[in-house]
């Protein structure tokens, strides 16, 4: 049985002895020591970055304790809504997010942006969950060819099979042999997920092979270069989605991002996130990401060009000093990282140990068909402003360690001296962008136009008891429609709402929090009329948040049956005949009025990021509409 009493650390430096649990003062001391050592290290890892002071400061903001929920399209002004949960919102952060979405359009050519992913792996899991099903096959990059070491495991844990691209001897995908694998394995998703690579991928050619199958490019390593117009341009070259973590060449916090131009794919991803993959998106980290996006907008082109120049220069300088660098004949690299072949230098772990003793941080990586290497990256020292002289000095120090010309401990003070000269973070955005009045003066809540009464966000409800509940016979048709609509594929959940008009002309709608797949007579509330912005209702509890929508459809077109589910029709939408309505806030007057305005033109409507709405004058007509769309959507 494990013991938690009087445990001592096994990782303390010589001369230190601590007992657990630590005192808070001891924790403060350890953090301070770690930070001090970090400031003396030459960071040449390819998978880390340094934040700007502005982005780092917001991580300690009081906002870190506040919730930022849902996608921007669905959040609405404060108070924010998540289903039936209402809470004070962060409207000013929404303004920043709206600006960051525009930045993504300009930097990446992406019409849609999803900032809620907590990490790159979380983005990968979201993509797998949204765009494939258990038993499907996902095509990935094999670990031996530079693929991420967890992709295959995540495929298995999600119940997916996997197959791999075929690479040739030049670290390049063999397109013809890969085509053969695709034709044999028929993957439902092509995922380009490399973590050890030097040159662009043939995205356009892979998309030609993929056809209608989604192609997802994971740019966790090169997102900052892509933002700066370098390396490659995945979305314009044919990738359906671009996803990444945001803390390598992209100089943001440890978060994830998904970008794309296909509305249906992005909405499927958004719904997948909203239905169990994320609640809080970690407010402070999200704001730091939004800041980094703006910094990249201002300085990304200069930064990306300098990163690639520095990577090639440092690789060449090491080669000139006798260090075996991979891919010399191809110019070493086209991105931020390069690889040293450890075979002439000793085992990879031993080489890394020497570097760490000298105060140099890098990664050992087994890649390129099992080649043991040390992976170096220059994105952090580039942001620190290292110039050619600094790179030559760094090459002297690293080569001396790799080639064992000096003991690492003798090199360590020289490394610390070099690092100490370059502490300022560069590429932090246009200084003029910070000018202007403070945010509290710039922000103003939306107001109604002069002379017009303010339209409320939500309809009011006046509830009285229902003398007699709905009978089984009266609601039988609505129950059957609810079961059918609630069982659609790609369904966010089995909630939603249904209304029907009884034979004596009374309008009934499902109550708040009911599930349309298993409705009972007691789940219905009668709508007896409306007065201004208030619905008069009779029932045991409040009606659905969308009750006003049902009231308006009854008033506008005489609808006797209305069914609203939470289905994402995806790409099948184009052939379903549904009229598409832009995203509107759940339960809002704006949503109800948008649907009521559109119902004159169609009996099937899709509210983006929300679900389908059907209306009809009879049960049989509504049943036929639902069955037709269900056949189309699978």
Curated annotation (Swiss-Prot):
Q: Does the keyword Transmembrane apply?
A: no
Residue span of region Disordered? 428-456
Domain of life, per lineage = Bacteria
Cofactor(s) this protein cannot do without? pyridoxal 5'-phosphate
An annotated GO cellular component of this protein is: cytoplasm
Pfam families given for it? Aldolase_II, SHMT
Return the EC number.
2.2.1.8
A GO molecular function term, named singly, is: fluorothreonine transaldolase activity
The PTM N6-(pyridoxal phosphate)lysine maps to 248
Residues that coordinate or bind pyridoxal 5'-phosphate:
67, 221, 247, 375
Keyword Transmembrane helix attributed: no
**Reaction(s) catalyzed by this protein?**
fluoroacetaldehyde + L-threonine = 4-fluoro-L-threonine + acetaldehyde
The cross-references to InterPro entries, in alphabetical order and at most eight, read: Aldolase_II/adducin_N, Aldolase_II/adducin_N_sf, F_threo_transal, PyrdxlP-dep_Trfase, PyrdxlP-dep_Trfase_major, PyrdxlP-dep_Trfase_small, Ser_HO-MeTrfase-like, SHMT-like_dom
Task: State what this protein does.
Answer: Transaldolase that catalyzes the final step in 4-fluorothreonine biosynthesis. Mediates a L-threonine/fluoroaceldehyde to 4-fluoro-L-threonine/acetaldehyde crossover reaction. Can also convert chloroacetaldehyde into 4-chloro-L-threonine. Does not use glycine as a substrate.
Query: What name is this protein filed under?
Result: Fluorothreonine transaldolase
Q: Which organism is it from?
A: Streptantibioticus cattleyicolor
